[in-house]
Amino acid sequence: MITRMSQLFLRTLRDDPADAEVPSHKLLIRAGYIRPVAPGLYSWLPLGLRVLRRIEHIVREEMNAIGGQEILFPALLPRAPYEATNRWTEYGDSVFRLQDRRGNDYLLGPTHEELFTLTVKGEYSSYKDFPVLLYQIQNKYRDEARPRAGILRVREFVMKDSYSFDIDDAGLKAAYHAHREAYQRIFARLQVRYVIVSAVSGAMGGSASEEFLAESPVGEDTFVRCLESGYAANVEAVITARPDPQPVEGLPEAVVHDTGDTPTIATLVDWANRAGLGRTVTAADTLKNVLLKVRQPGGDWELLAIGLPGDREVDDKRLGAALEPAEYVLLDDADFARYPFLVKGYIGPKALKDNGVRYLVDPRVVDGTSWITGADEPGRHVVGLVAGRDFTADGTIEAAEVRDGDPSPDGAGPLVSARGIEVAHIFQLGRKYTDAFTADVLGEDGKPVRLTMGSYGLGVSRMVAVIAEQHHDELGLRWPASVAPFDVHLVIANKDAQARAGATALADDLDRLGVEVLLDDRQASPGVKFKDAELLGVPWIVVVGRGWADGVVELRDRFAGQTRELATGPSLAADIAAALRG
């Protein structure tokens, strides 16, 4: 197929959009692949849609290869199925809800576990019908509070979501493994650099869960890995290496001290090192207590205290994952006024216990560890408060930040952190959704068998931005051949009529060989055409320029930055096609 730029719906921009933050956003706008409509909403213009469709094609091929069958559900979904799984409430403000003219509630689908489960239940009733693997590629909707980074975080996006249904856990694990391998093949074909990390399931539910993160400095997800062992996990899923408990017998008694105006960890440590305690005190020796209000879906607000070493900050993502599906907020001044037993800056475990406040601590707070913490009075702290002797928590929580150098949970070495963009997430859901809808089939022994389920998502439209992030230079985009909008960008950089005719004939010859050609036949200067060719990012550029009179054209490799000359003649199109094939 030949597409003429003189007829293509395209306008490139020389300057970056004022609101663009990341390279992919800047380049996809400048190159005319997408255009903004509203915050978090984008239109796909012809070039962008071609890239999107090529990614979809690769995803379909790999899903079909593992036995997937494509279907399509509506994006507008009724309330009832989501009530059955409690996700109507659990999703909170992150979904778009609406009513029809009769007052019936609907949402714009963020994901479709409920509909897939109900459909399979309605169609199949015997173990002989399984396993089943269904998928769709469809628009999804989430009411992002802060859409950002172009099409990386939006309110409408294209996603491939697939669902496996099996009669036993062995079948589920096989389907999960098949998807894991299929995704690795997809990302290899897309030339995306990625890492597979352990993850949390969140509102999706289930047990085993892994994310595929594309390595990128603009990624919103922080992950850690151990270079010695290959362990990798999203920070939300990291399990803190828990020290062994220590005996409490023989430890000095806790002593309350007047510490003056020391409401922060820094001021407390400064006091401790001037108080003659007989040792150097660091923030890691202190226990700070953070107060929250938490509310389960449909419930009331309750107080929750979290204790963690003073040298650690609370990681909002880890805290949110640990409390899922509850929502939470930090206490404000009005809350502290409402609970006078909470002395801000001097909170200790005693007042929490005496007033029935649930208290969860970091896994490093084990029996036998000694701490400096609040004494529940202004200007007073207690030194030598021993866990397991002087206070006991109600449990542990993974809410503290994870740092470079922390020990890996597998004990193999230190952790190092990096940033990534989530491009896929796979879950072994188990029976959460089939339990909600009593999705049973008749087993081989004639008794009911509850189906078990897997869910496997892949961000198709996000992948366009991810590839742009990983494959660009200072001149513009550099699409891998597997997803590029065209195979060859043929630039006519010569006003000579014979050269133009020769370029048109070359485009026809390439078309007959199955090469998709973008022919720049515009009445524009060579400089403008070259800048656009570099910006658009088609992997191969053929220039019909001044060398045409000498019997040569230029072939430029957009990835390698190399240029070579090819002789004109009957074999020119075949020579170019051979270069494309490598």
UniProtKB/Swiss-Prot annotation:
The keyword Aminoacyl-tRNA synthetase applies. It is an enzyme of class 6 (ligase). Its main location: cytoplasm. It is found in: Cytoplasm. It holds the Pfam family tRNA-synt_2b. One of its GO terms (cellular component) is cytosol. The keyword Nucleotide-binding applies. Its EC number is 6.1.1.15. One of its GO terms (molecular function) is ATP binding. GO terms for biological process: prolyl-tRNA aminoacylation. Consists of three domains: the N-terminal catalytic domain, the editing domain and the C-terminal anticodon-binding domain. PANTHER family: MITOCHONDRIAL RIBOSOME PROTEIN L39/PROLYL-TRNA LIGASE FAMILY MEMBER, PROLINE--TRNA LIGASE. Catalyzes the attachment of proline to tRNA(Pro) in a two-step reaction: proline is first activated by ATP to form Pro-AMP and then transferred to the acceptor end of tRNA(Pro). As ProRS can inadvertently accommodate and process non-cognate amino acids such as alanine and cysteine, to avoid such errors it has two additional distinct editing activities against alanine. One activity is designated as 'pretransfer' editing and involves the tRNA(Pro)-independent hydrolysis of activated Ala-AMP. HAMAP family: Pro_tRNA_synth_type1 (MF_01569). Belongs to the class-II aminoacyl-tRNA synthetase family. ProS type 1 subfamily. This is Proline--tRNA ligase. It comes from Mycobacterium avium (strain 104). The gene is proS.
